[in-house]
Amino acid sequence: MPEGPEIRRAADNLEAAIKGKPLTDVWFAFAQLKPYESQLTGQLVTRIETRGKALLTHFSNGLTLYSHNQLYGVWRVIDTGEIPQTTRILRVRLQTADKTILLYSASDIEMLTAEQLTTHPFLQRVGPDVLDARLTPEEVKARLLSPRFCNRQFSGLLLDQAFLAGLGNYLRVEILWQVGLTGQHKAKDLNEAQLNALSHALLDIPRLSYTTRGQADENKHHGALFRFKVFHRDGEACERCGGIIEKTTLSSRPFYWCPHCQK
């Protein structure tokens, strides 16, 4: 499943295609959304927001399209009039004069009013987004030390969208390597220096992945993501200590780590 940086970059691409342009045609696959087709035609997409792995497409009439890609959903941008060659099932089409955005295969799609946004179950449950520039390391540290999260092992906590939205497995792996910790640790057992390092890494690593994606610099990884330090590098030497990176399973997900410098 894509993690926060990939979801945000997808939202950027969608915004670049249709933001601020009148919608010339709107189509939904689901019957409960059909009444909104006429309501949205002629409206503008004002912004596309991410909340972890969910997308919120805001329209000029105050409505918001909520979509969660889950495992199989994918958004695509095409030239208006183009007919994509795909076996995926189309769920949403938002068309402007020159560009059209398409959502395939997703099933978690709703139209929400401003009031419903404040009470939506997923949006109520999800924590602050790691790519939200307003979120600070101090606020992350406070969440780590809160009664709700301080006694949970990082192996599970860093996959929990209620803690911080947008984290996922590769980010969990890279963050814990960056701070030299294993997944069995809990925030309540860390010293001040470790807490500060982790609070910064929980924001710095996702933001680095987002900002360097596809750029030709030392953090590039196969043109897709920043260069991984340990993820999918089992059997290779750790660049920090020279130890051999190992692979195991934590919280039912593959976990990569260096036993020599992650304690």
UniProtKB/Swiss-Prot annotation:
<protein>
    <recommendedName>
        <fullName>Endonuclease 8</fullName>
        <ecNumber>3.2.2.-</ecNumber>
        <ecNumber>4.2.99.18</ecNumber>
    </recommendedName>
</protein>
<dbReference type="InterPro" id="IPR010979">
    <property type="entry name" value="Ribosomal_uS13-like_H2TH"/>
</dbReference>
<feature type="active site" description="Schiff-base intermediate with DNA">
    <location>
        <position position="2"/>
    </location>
</feature>
<keyword id="KW-0326">Glycosidase</keyword>
<dbReference type="InterPro" id="IPR015886">
    <property type="entry name" value="DNA_glyclase/AP_lyase_DNA-bd"/>
</dbReference>
<comment type="similarity">
    <text>Belongs to the FPG family.</text>
</comment>
<dbReference type="InterPro" id="IPR044091">
    <property type="entry name" value="EcNei-like_N"/>
</dbReference>
<dbReference type="InterPro" id="IPR015887">
    <property type="entry name" value="DNA_glyclase_Znf_dom_DNA_BS"/>
</dbReference>
<dbReference type="InterPro" id="IPR012319">
    <property type="entry name" value="FPG_cat"/>
</dbReference>
<dbReference type="Pfam" id="PF06827">
    <property type="entry name" value="zf-FPG_IleRS"/>
</dbReference>
<keyword id="KW-0234">DNA repair</keyword>
<feature type="binding site">
    <location>
        <position position="70"/>
    </location>
    <ligand>
        <name>DNA</name>
    </ligand>
</feature>
<keyword id="KW-0863">Zinc-finger</keyword>
<dbReference type="Pfam" id="PF01149">
    <property type="entry name" value="Fapy_DNA_glyco"/>
</dbReference>
<keyword id="KW-0227">DNA damage</keyword>
<feature type="active site" description="Proton donor; for beta-elimination activity">
    <location>
        <position position="53"/>
    </location>
</feature>
<dbReference type="GO" id="GO:0000703">
    <property type="term" value="F:oxidized pyrimidine nucleobase lesion DNA N-glycosylase activity"/>
</dbReference>
<dbReference type="GO" id="GO:0008270">
    <property type="term" value="F:zinc ion binding"/>
</dbReference>
<feature type="binding site">
    <location>
        <position position="169"/>
    </location>
    <ligand>
        <name>DNA</name>
    </ligand>
</feature>
<keyword id="KW-0238">DNA-binding</keyword>
<keyword id="KW-0479">Metal-binding</keyword>
<dbReference type="GO" id="GO:0140078">
    <property type="term" value="F:class I DNA-(apurinic or apyrimidinic site) endonuclease activity"/>
</dbReference>
<dbReference type="Pfam" id="PF06831">
    <property type="entry name" value="H2TH"/>
</dbReference>
<feature type="active site" description="Proton donor; for delta-elimination activity">
    <location>
        <position position="253"/>
    </location>
</feature>
<dbReference type="InterPro" id="IPR010663">
    <property type="entry name" value="Znf_FPG/IleRS"/>
</dbReference>
<keyword id="KW-0511">Multifunctional enzyme</keyword>
<dbReference type="InterPro" id="IPR000214">
    <property type="entry name" value="Znf_DNA_glyclase/AP_lyase"/>
</dbReference>
<feature type="zinc finger region" description="FPG-type">
    <location>
        <begin position="229"/>
        <end position="263"/>
    </location>
</feature>
<keyword id="KW-0456">Lyase</keyword>
<dbReference type="GO" id="GO:0003684">
    <property type="term" value="F:damaged DNA binding"/>
</dbReference>
<comment type="function">
    <text>Involved in base excision repair of DNA damaged by oxidation or by mutagenic agents. Acts as a DNA glycosylase that recognizes and removes damaged bases. Has a preference for oxidized pyrimidines, such as thymine glycol, 5,6-dihydrouracil and 5,6-dihydrothymine. Has AP (apurinic/apyrimidinic) lyase activity and introduces nicks in the DNA strand. Cleaves the DNA backbone by beta-delta elimination to generate a single-strand break at the site of the removed base with both 3'- and 5'-phosphates.</text>
</comment>
<keyword id="KW-0862">Zinc</keyword>
<feature type="binding site">
    <location>
        <position position="125"/>
    </location>
    <ligand>
        <name>DNA</name>
    </ligand>
</feature>
<dbReference type="GO" id="GO:0006284">
    <property type="term" value="P:base-excision repair"/>
</dbReference>
<keyword id="KW-0378">Hydrolase</keyword>
<dbReference type="InterPro" id="IPR035937">
    <property type="entry name" value="MutM-like_N-ter"/>
</dbReference>
<dbReference type="InterPro" id="IPR023713">
    <property type="entry name" value="Endonuclease-VIII"/>
</dbReference>
<feature type="active site" description="Proton donor">
    <location>
        <position position="3"/>
    </location>
</feature>
